[in-house]
Amino acid sequence: DFFKDSFDVVYIASPNSLHFSQAKIALSAGKHVILEKPAVTQPQEWQELVQTAKDNKCFIFEAARNYHEDAFATIKDFLADKQILGADFNYAKYSSKMPNLLAGDTPNVFSDRFAGGALMDLGIYTLYAAVRLFGKPTHATYQAQKLDNSIDLNGDGILSYPNYQVHIKAGKNITSNLPCEIYTTDGTLTLDTIEHVSSAIFTDHQGNEVQLPIQQAPHTMTEEVAAFANMIKQADRTL
């Protein structure tokens, strides 16, 4: 009965492992779907959802909001004429659910049943930033501190590109106060964060600084919602 209503779009923010089945039901009912990141837990699930969306003339989106921020377009344009030497991206924040975990409970975000963990929750921001700015890596590795159920509490990854590497850190049992950095032959670009950039400063090898014109949206979801709405309106399936 829910999907018989006249709304156009459904936003699914249930535990990760439930995304696939719920999204398929919504798409089959002719509804556009926005899935909270990570959209699915297996690549083949995404492929099936994309096909279901096409079959029902619907759109499916992953709400990886930093990918759509205007800040990343500004950063990408700034880096266009520079030779990249590497980057360090991190997002680690002590989870509000850690006390529950330490008390012996297993919150959804730390559950293998629900495909939780640091990389799935916070690390995805670092991955999307890397793909947005540098493209798809040729190889990726991830080493993690894990619970007995195999879910990662924190970890470090390496994304390999032909001429450089991007190091990522994700954590839910630690907090990192470090900025993120992109290294070039001309100097270093420092970002205050990777998930909602408000400051980007380039420092050359002589110590001269250039502040990039970052205009942060008033709400963290403003830019991704605008992007999704425009794609639906224009029937544009390209990113």
Residue ranges with predicted function:
Residues 47-65, 84-87:
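Rossmann-fold dehydrogenase core element
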Residues 69-138:
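Predominantly a Rossmann-like dinucleotide-binding segment in NAD(P)-dependent oxidoreductases
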Residues 126-197, 225-235:
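Contiguous beta-strand/loop segments that form the cofactor/metal-binding neighborhood of enzyme cores
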